[in-house]
Amino acid sequence: QARAWWSPSGAGLWMSTLLRPKCDRSIWGGIALVAGAATRRALTALGADEIELRWPNDLYARSRKLGGILAESKDQSAGAWISLGIGINIDLKNEELREKAPDGLSDRIICLREVSPAAESDPGKIALAIIEELRPLYGQFQQGEKLGDILGGDLSVAGREVLVERPGKPVLRGTATGIG
């Protein structure tokens, strides 16, 4: 879905890393969830609380969006790769949100400072913590471990109503029990 990410200059962390997975390409779609789990764990280790990883690639706190993960893959003559992008709102000023945010957005986003004022807010330290958390999870992912085992309790989908939308087919509704 062509959605835009908005955050004022200097108010967050936006990072990208290039991955060259050796695992079967059919499972590459799970890498955004793996990165989301790593990001959630890193933020929690740095003092943030109330952080939820929501399907398929969003980080929420207090029912508002804190950040997101984007994974795009490419096949080229030099090999296949995934560009993994992570964005986190760290310090958004309320007046800046009201003045500059696109219509209706200021009520739907939140920043790390608002959620956990004492949490680490240095973008460099947060980026390093994310990479340190991602490294072992990415290794498990490449070794073919089940996504549900890698994520553990990081994904906040269990017990929630979910919809499955398929082109040209009826929408399926159900209650999520986890991820396989």
Describe the residue ranges of each PLM region.
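General beta-strand structural signal in soluble alpha/beta enzymes
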Residues: 51-55
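Long, positively charged amphipathic alpha-helical accessory segments at protein N-termini or as interdomain linkers
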Residues: 23, 29, 33-50, 61-180
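DPxDG-like acidic metal-binding loop motif
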Residues: 2-23, 31-35
